[in-house]
Structures are given as C-alpha cells and as structure tokens.
C-alpha cells in the first residue's frame, strides 16, 4: 500500500491519500488507520466511485455512489450497503426513491423512463404486496402484487373509463366484474385477459 498524508505516533491519522495493492484509492480523513470522516472519496479499481461519510473504514451515513455502468445512488449507507432513505438512478433513466434494506429496495416509488410510475413494497427488487401502478397512457392499477406481477385482488381503471374489479393470476384477469364506460357490465371468468368461460353480461339498454 502507498500512503501520502499526516501521521500521529507512527499511525495513519488525519488527512491523506491511500492507494492499496489492488489499485483502489481513498482520499480523505483517517482515524486509527481507517477511513473515517464526514467526506471522503473512494475510487475503486472497477471504476465505481463513492463520496461521502466513512466510519471505521466503511461507508456509513450520507453519501453518493457512482457506478461505472452509469447508475447512481444518493442516500444513506450502513456497513457499506444502501440502508434507509435514498434515490437510485439507472443509466437507462429509470429512478427509484424510497427506503432500502441491505442494498435492496424495500418500499417507495419507482419512476420508469417511459413515464410509468409504481409505488409500494418490494421483494427481490420487484413490487410485492399492496401497491399502485400508474401508466403513462392514463390507466391505473391499485391492488396486490406478487414479485412484480398483478396477483390476487385489484382494481384496474382504464383511461377510456372502463373499470375491472376482481382477481388476477400471474398478471392476467382471472375472475371479476368489468364495468364498461357505456354502462354494460360483465361478471365472470377470463382467460389470457379476455372474457372466456362462465359469466353474465348485462347490457345498459
């Protein structure tokens, strides 16, 4: 390792620059020979760069992490992991703002680059449990999700005024009530998102 900076009784302490054997470079404050301070910068050999607070050699507290691939995270860290409130921006333009746990999205709002917005709880980086999905075209879904797919009870409101209220299975309508904007009502089964099987259709007239 190569260190340039201040010393205290033969220990690295104060401001300095440390380049380790792998080529990672840290510039900032040191306490007891470890990265510690309100603002330091760690440039990793893989191209990633972290700037923020360090405690005992780890990212802890507010910071910004820029990935070589173009993604960026701004928010709280704990033990080198994304923890608590933060904003993650993908190189694609997608953006998530909310709570993180052990670097994974836990709850919050996901804004897609195409204008779609979803909000709720997450599991394995996918919507899970109660949530909402607002589509750019004006459609909206409010209901249950299972690993990113509509599953269980939910209400889908179409931009043209149609409303579906019922059950979903694997992201598709399964059984429920469809209220058409013209006043017609269908109650029954579906297959591949289309009316099929047992059901009752009531015409407004």
Which residues does each predicted region cover?
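Glycine/tyrosine- and acidic-biased, solvent-exposed loop/turn segments at the edges of beta-strands
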Residues: 1-205
């Amino acid at each position: 390792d190569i260190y340039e900076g201040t010393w205290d009784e033969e220990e690295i302490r104060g401001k300095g620059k440390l380049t380790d054997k792998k080529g990672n470079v840290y510039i900032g404050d040191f306490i007891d020979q470890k990265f510690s301070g309100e603002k330091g910068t760690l440039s990793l050999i893989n191209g990633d760069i972290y700037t923020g607070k360090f405690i005992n050699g780890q990212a802890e507290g507010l910071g910004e992490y820029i990935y070589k691939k173009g993604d960026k995270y701004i928010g709280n860290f704990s033990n080198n992991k994304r923890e608590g409130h933060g904003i993650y921006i993908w190189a694609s333009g997608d953006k998530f703002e909310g709570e993180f746990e052990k670097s994974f999205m836990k709850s919050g709002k996901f804004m897609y680059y195409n204008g779609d917005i979803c909000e709720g709880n997450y599991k394995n980086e996918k919507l899970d449990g109660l949530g909402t999905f607002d589509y750019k075209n004006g459609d909206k879904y409010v209901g249950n999700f299972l690993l990113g797919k509509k599953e269980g009870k939910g209400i889908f409101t179409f931009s043209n005024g149609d409303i579906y209220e019922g059950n979903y299975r694997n992201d598709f309508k399964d059984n429920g009530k469809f209220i058409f904007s013209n006043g017609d009502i269908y109650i029954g089964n579906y297959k591949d998102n289309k009316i099929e099987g047992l059901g009752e259709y009531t015409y407004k007239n």
